């Protein structure tokens, strides 16, 4: 009997720790301590049965984080608000469940030949990037990418920073092939705002984080789109030009498991796809640069300021990493 025990479990038994089941991780006292600290920090409570399940998941994620950080990678991982969840749960709650494919989107962006500045960060140019928001357990990232890009475009054009209503896009933009909490594309959301003749502000159409019925009031619209610039598929250099010369750019990419626990550094992955049919998360490129010979994008996420680098991340630039150059666009505001 004892010979069949996994080595880790056998060690735990010898130390007097309860022996775990064959299908379970043997969670050690250090992992339990970190889990309880994490629960306190994130104000989590569970039933007895769920506690055991979440502890197992947390310990598995904890070990993946440590293994990654002990390896040779360009980014670090850390515990965050997702650390008690499996990637299957995260995909269901936070990423697109309705497949999106922007390959049919007609490009209309005409780019020049450069040269462009070696680095750009719209956050440092002035009040041109709105604060990081939190989409919650709804696959509405596309709405935050959309509002973030339009908020920046309006601020660049007028000097006035607005906070636009993601919930309006969740509730009202279905006719433009968007699906609320199940997914959508910024390019299609920009088209909705253009033809709908506006988007309301966050204060008059507050975010709920769930699908609802459309409550748009045209007289309260404060953000308007004159045109949409759709960047040619896979033309990452055109994205550089657009960010350098005009505006932060919305894009979509494929999130895989290691991205969820991102903390700092330049993210890259060998497990993601690079095609438009696999993208599952939309974000906003607010700048770019290079570090230690690795070019990167500076990207605003919508998982709150406690995730990543105060709500931002860096991702390797120039390789269409995880399909990031497949679905890029930005709005031209009507001001």
Curated annotation (Swiss-Prot):
Annotated disulfide bonds: 102-327, 138-181, 172-214, 272-322
Function as written in the Swiss-Prot or TrEMBL entry: Important for the overall degradation of proteins in lysosomes.
Name listed for the protein in its UniProt record: Pro-cathepsin H
Gene3D superfamilies the record matches: Cysteine proteinases (3.90.70.10)
Active-site feature positions: 141, 281, 301
Top-rank EC class of the record's enzyme: hydrolase
Homology family: Belongs to the peptidase C1 family.
GO MF annotation: an example: cysteine-type endopeptidase activity
Subunit structure: Composed of a mini chain and a large chain. The large chain may be split into heavy and light chain. All chains are held together by disulfide bonds.
Pfam families, per database record: Inhibitor_I29 (PF08246), Peptidase_C1 (PF00112)
Signal peptide start-end: 1-22
Record's subcellular location: Lysosome
Any GO BP annotation: zymogen activation
Keyword field: Disulfide bond, Glycoprotein, Hydrolase, Lysosome, Protease, Signal, Thiol protease, Zymogen
Impact upon substituting residue 126 to R: In a colorectal cancer sample; somatic mutation
Residues that carry a glycan: 101, 230
Major location category of this protein: other
Reactions catalysed according to its record: Hydrolysis of proteins, acting as an aminopeptidase (notably, cleaving Arg-|-Xaa bonds) as well as an endopeptidase
UniProt keyword Cell division present: no
EC number: 3.4.22.16
GO CC, any one term: alveolar lamellar body
PANTHER family associated with the record: CYSTEINE PROTEASE FAMILY C1-RELATED
